[in-house]
């Protein structure tokens, strides 16, 4: 049986090539594993920043159980308003930032890919030089097989793969740009909200003592219900003697059959498009009450005059219509369909 009888250096060279290929295969596997681990870390980071349940309203309810002084209530009101503004700003800002960042990342990815392709080069003379060096080594060390096997093999330079996604790698310039863009969006959003809050609206309300007495005042969208009741009290005192000794804490504001807490602002209902049992809470113009119209199904965005009521009157008459329909406002409760009973 014929056998191949080549130089001993050929066997050594073959072993070198086998070891070289094995090392390259191991490096490739390590690179794949590292990319998979980095992608998993990125996924875990994204999950940590997912939206979570906002418990601000629940905390306010639990902290205002029982009698609370006016100063404490004002402090809690201010803290709640600031917290709500931050949450709304963060939510709106996150949406706008995500869109802009995706566009920027796509643009940078394409530019980086073009740059890497342009810089990627392979030297054709490198292979020839390596072959010449190996031939010289074979001629000089034919009888020293083991020593030849241990000689280091010159590695070819591996070019970078332009298709690999490197967006998850740390990049100080990119992070600074994202932070700057995020801050600009936040400031722009806050300016828009302040402009909305400063806009003036006309509030039509009815002082309710068993019958309605309609009045109108002008307020700003950023004003709270407490500020509105203070203004309404100034208007009503000259016509109703029972209100001359009353304070804001003795009054209730009823809008669409819901008892609205004093710390809420008109802005809160406008930006969230909140709805009540019998109409929207974000409209303050007046339409006919649907309970006095033949077809109650035509009501959509029509609003009714809110009622200003003394707490003492409500406690005496809460079992009688319309007070029997009133219930405390709950921001978590949805009134997608209006009711008239």
From Swiss-Prot:
BP-aspect Gene Ontology terms: central nervous system development; chromatin organization; embryonic cranial skeleton morphogenesis; mRNA processing; regulation of mRNA splicing, via spliceosome; RNA splicing
Q: Compositional bias (Acidic residues) at which positions?
A: 125-147
Task: Show the Pfam families listed in the entry.
Answer: XAP5
| Annotated GO CC locations | nucleus
The reply to whether Magnesium figures as a keyword in the UniProt entry is no
Superkingdom of source: Eukaryota
Keyword Nucleus carried by entry: yes
Annotated region (Disordered) at: 1-27, 80-147
> Phenotype of the disruptant?
Fam50a depletion results in early neurogenesis defects, abnormal anterior development impacting the brain, eyes and cartilage apparent at day 5 post-fertilization (5 dpf), and lethality occurring by 6 dpf.
* Bias type Basic and acidic residues, positions: 80-115
Q: Which InterPro entries match?
A: FAM50A/XAP5_C (IPR048337), XAP5 (IPR007005)
Q: Where in the cell is it found?
A: Nucleus
What are the entry keywords? mRNA processing, mRNA splicing, Nucleus
Q: What does this protein do?
A: Probably involved in the regulation of pre-mRNA splicing.
Tell me the protein family, please: Belongs to the FAM50 family.
What is the protein name for this chain? Protein FAM50A
Q: What organism is this sequence from?
A: Danio rerio
Query: Lineage of the native species?
Result: Eukaryota, Metazoa, Chordata, Craniata, Vertebrata
């Amino acid at each position: 049986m014929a056998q191949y009888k080549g130089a001993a250096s050929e066997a050594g060279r073959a072993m070198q090539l086998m070891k070289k290929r094995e090392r390259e295969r191991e490096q490739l596997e390590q690179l794949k594993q590292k990319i998979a681990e980095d992608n998993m870390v990125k996924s875990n980071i994204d999950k940590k920043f997912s939206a979570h349940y906002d418990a601000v309203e629940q905390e306010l309810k639990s902290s205002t159980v029982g009698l609370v002084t006016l100063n404490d209530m004002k402090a809690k009101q201010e803290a709640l308003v600031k917290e709500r503004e931050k949450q709304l700003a963060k939510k709106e800002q996150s949406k706008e930032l995500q869109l802009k960042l995706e566009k920027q990342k796509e643009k940078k990815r394409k530019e980086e890919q073009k740059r890497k392709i342009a810089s990627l080069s392979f030297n054709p003379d490198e292979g020839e030089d390596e072959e010449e060096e190996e031939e010289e080594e074979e001629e000089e060390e034919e009888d020293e097989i083991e020593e030849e096997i241990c000689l280091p093999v010159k590695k070819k330079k591996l070019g970078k793969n332009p298709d690999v996604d490197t967006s998850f790698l740390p990049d100080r310039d990119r992070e600074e740009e994202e932070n700057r863009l995020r801050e600009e969006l936040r400031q722009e959003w806050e300016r828009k909200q302040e402009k909305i809050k400063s806009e003036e609206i006309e509030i039509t309300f009815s002082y309710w003592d068993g019958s309605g007495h309609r009045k109108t005042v002008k307020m700003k969208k950023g004003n709270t219900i407490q500020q509105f009741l203070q203004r309404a009290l100034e208007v009503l005192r000259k016509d109703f003697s029972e209100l001359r000794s009353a304070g804001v804490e003795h009054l209730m504001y009823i809008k669409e059959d819901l008892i609205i807490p004093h710390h809420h602002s008109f802005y809160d209902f406008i930006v969230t498009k909140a709805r009540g049992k019998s109409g929207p809470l974000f409209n303050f113009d007046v339409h006919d009450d649907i309970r006095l119209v033949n077809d109650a199904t035509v009501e959509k965005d029509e609003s009714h005059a809110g009622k200003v009521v003394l707490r003492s009157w409500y406690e005496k008459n809460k079992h009688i219509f319309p007070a029997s329909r009133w219930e405390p406002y709950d921001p978590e409760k949805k009134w997608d369909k209006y009711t008239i009973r």
